[in-house]
Design a protein with these regions (language model features):
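Disulfide-stabilized, aromatic/cysteine-rich ligand-recognition loop
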Residues: 2-43, 59-148
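Short, acidic, Ser/Thr-enriched surface-loop or helix-capping motifs
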Residues: 48
Length: 148
């Protein structure tokens, strides 16, 4: 579109406490969520894949560590870890459980680093916030061969 060059393509927080952007062309008035068509779609025609609201995903949250993903951490760090017998497994309590769900994508209240699709956070599945939503999806409608 004409006039879109150099403008932000997602609704996110720019700096400390700056929810709407700066004065002039970069002010998107995105104090909270914006309409779905406020920004251009991605190459697949999907809107707001980053920014506006975080999206719940189906995954149960599990933190990644070097034992799970050895190729991401090629240095063997077991010499620097506490031994397992030093932990009290009887009274172990964690925020991470089978009820912890992943959300990602960044929201209007998050900084730019959360807009990356690789960033993950978690929240109890029965919780809600003003910055988390979900995306409705369906199979393609119409007949095959009509450009869909």
């Amino acid at each position: 579109k004409r006039g879109q060059l150099g403008k932000f393509q997602a609704n996110f927080k720019r700096g400390r406490g700056d929810y709407a952007g700066i004065a002039g062309a970069l002010n998107d008035a995105g104090f909270v969520t914006t309409s779905i068509y406020e920004y251009a779609p991605n190459d697949f025609g999907l809107y707001n894949m980053a920014g506006n609201v975080n999206e719940w995903v189906y995954d149960i949250y599990r933190p990644l560590n070097f034992r799970d993903m050895e190729d991401l951490n090629p240095i063997r760090k077991s010499d620097f870890l506490d031994s397992e017998e030093d932990y009290d497994s009887e009274n172990f309590n964690s925020m991470i459980s089978n009820e912890s769900r992943v959300y990602k994508g960044g929201s209007w209240a998050d900084g730019a680093m959360w807009l990356s699709p690789g960033t993950r956070r978690f929240l109890a599945q029965d919780s809600s916030t003003a910055t988390v939503g979900f995306r409705c999806a369906t199979t393609a409608l119409g007949t095959a061969g009509n450009g869909m």
